[in-house]
C-alpha cells in the first residue's frame, strides 16, 4: 500500500497515530480498572475524543477491536491459560505503533491494473489536507488478493523496519470455494535447525529447505544485540536500537517462514497431498545439549509459529496438518530398520548395513512410514529448494 503523495502519507500517518492513541488510552483505562478489581466495560467513552480525526466508524471499530481483545483475554483466563491483559500499541520509548482498523463497509477496494483503496477521514483534518466533505484518502495498493468473497474489517499498519505501509484484508470464503486435494497422498515433515524442513511424500518426492544461509544474518543480528546490551548502563535493559534490531530479526524470520510454507504447500498440493504429518518437537524444545541448536530451534525456526502458518496455509488448499510423535525417526535406518548402531554427522547418515543417506530426508521418510504405513521409493537426490 502506497500513499500517492507526501501530503497523503502525512495524513495517513496522522490517522494511524490517532488510532494508536485511542487504543492506548482505552487500554490504559481498562487495565487500571482490571487491576483495581473493577469492570473493564465501565471505561470512559473515548470515541468522542477521536471522532473528529478518525471519523465515527473508524473510532468505533478500534474500540470494538479492543473489546474483542479483552473478551479473548477473559476467555483464556476461564480456560486456565497463563495469559496477560491486552497490551499497548508501542511504548513510551519507541513511540506508538501506527495501526488502525477500517470497518468492512467503509472502504471501497478496486483491484486492477492500478489497484486503489479509499479510507474514511474525520472532518477535522480535511481542510488542512484539501479534502471535501465527502472525500476519502485514496491509496495505491500493490498485489492481488487470492480471495474475492465477502470482505471483512481492513487492517492498516506501518512497518518501520521496511519503511512501508501494509494492509491486511480478511475475507470470509465459503467451504465450497476452498481448494480440495487433487488426490489422497500424504507427506511427512522433519523440522530442524540446519535444514528448516525435510519432506517426503507418498508419491516418492522429497524436498529440502536449507536454513544455513537464512540463519547467518539472524545469528549476526543476535550477536549485535548482545554487543549493544553489554554497553548499556546498569539501570537499563534495552535501547531503541536494540528493540529495532529485535523487530528486524523477527521480520526477516517471519518472511522466510511465510515464503517457505507457501512454496511447500503449493508443491504438496500439486502432488495430490491431502494430509501432512509434522513431528511433535515438544520434548526437543524443552532442552538441547547445543546452545546453537537451541537458538535455531527456539528463535529462528520458531516451531510453534511455523506450525500455525503451515496449518493456516494448508487449510486454503484443503490439506490437513497433523502433529504426531516422531520417536526414533532420526536414528532408524530406512533400509533395514536398525536404530542402535546407526551414526549421524550433520547431514550425513550411515548404517552398518551399508546404507548412506541424508539424515533429515531419511528421518522424514521414516516418519512417513510410521504414520502412513508406507515406505515409498524415492529418488537418489531430493530437490533442494532455495528461497529468496
For each feature predicted by the language model, list its residue ranges.
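Nucleic-acid substrate recognition interfaces
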Residues: 1-388
Amino acid at each position: 500500500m502506497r500513499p500517492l503523495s507526501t501530503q497523503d502519507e502525512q495524513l495517513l500517518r496522522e490517522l494511524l497515530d490517532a488510532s494508536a492513541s485511542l487504543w492506548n488510552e482505552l487500554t490504559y483505562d481498562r487495565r487500571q480498572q482490571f487491576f483495581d478489581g473493577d469492570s473493564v466495560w465501565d471505561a470512559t467513552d473515548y470515541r468522542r475524543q477521536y471522532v473528529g480525526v478518525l471519523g465515527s466508524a473508524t473510532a468505533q471499530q478500534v474500540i470494538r477491536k479492543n473489546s474483542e481483545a479483552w473478551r479473548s483475554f477473559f476467555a483464556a483466563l476461564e480456560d486456565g491459560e497463563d495469559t496477560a491483559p491486552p497490551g499497548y500499541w508501542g511504548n513510551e520509548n519507541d513511540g506508538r505503533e501506527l495501526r488502525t482498523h477500517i470497518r468492512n463497509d467503509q472502504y471501497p477496494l478496486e483491484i486492477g491494473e492500478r489497484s486503489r483503496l479509499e479510507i474514511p477521514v474525520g472532518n477535522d483534518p480535511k481542510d488542512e489536507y484539501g479534502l471535501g466533505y465527502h472525500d476519502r484518502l485514496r491509496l495505491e495498493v500493490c498485489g492481488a488478493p487470492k480471495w474475492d468473497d465477502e470482505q471483512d474489517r481492513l487492517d492498516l499498519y506501518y512497518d518501520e523496519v521496511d519503511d512501508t505501509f501494509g494492509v491486511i484484508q480478511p475475507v470470509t470464503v465459503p467451504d465450497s470455494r476452498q481448494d480440495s486435494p487433487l488426490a489422497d497422498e500424504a507427506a511427512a515433515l522433519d523440522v530442524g535447525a540446519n535444514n528448516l524442513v525435510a519432506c517426503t511424500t507418498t508419491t516418492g518426492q522429497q524436498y529440502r529447505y536449507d536454513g544455513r544461509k537464512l540463519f547467518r544474518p539472524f545469528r549476526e543480528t543476535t550477536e549485535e544485540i548482545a554487543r549493544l546490551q553489554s554497553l548499556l548502563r546498569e539501570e537499563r535493559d534495552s535501547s531503541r536500537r536494540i528493540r529495532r534490531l529485535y523487530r528486524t530479526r523477527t521480520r526477516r524470520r517471519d518472511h522466510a517462514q511465510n515464503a517457505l510454507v507457501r512454496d511447500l504447500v503449493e508443491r504438496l498440493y500439486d502432488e495430490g497431498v491431502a494430509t501432512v504429518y509434522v513431528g511433535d518437537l515438544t520434548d526437543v524444545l524443552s532442552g538441547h545439549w547445543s546452545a546453537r541448536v537451541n537458538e535455531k530451534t527456539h528463535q529462528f525456526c520458531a516451531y510453534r509459529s511455523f506450525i500455525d502458518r503451515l496449518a493456516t496455509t494448508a487449510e486454503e488448499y484443503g490439506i490437513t496438518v497433523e502433529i504426531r510423535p516422531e520417536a526414533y525417526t532420526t536414528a532408524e535406518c530406512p533400509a533395514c530398520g536398525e536404530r542402535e548402531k546407526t551414526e549421524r554427522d550433520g547431514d550425513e547418515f550411515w548404517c552398518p548395513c551399508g546404507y548412506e543417506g541424508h539424515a533429515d530426508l531419511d528421518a522424514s521418510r521414516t516418519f512417513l512410514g510410521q504414520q502412513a504405513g508406507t515406505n515409498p521409493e524415492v529418488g537418489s537426490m531430493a530437490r533442494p529448494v532455495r528461497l529468496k
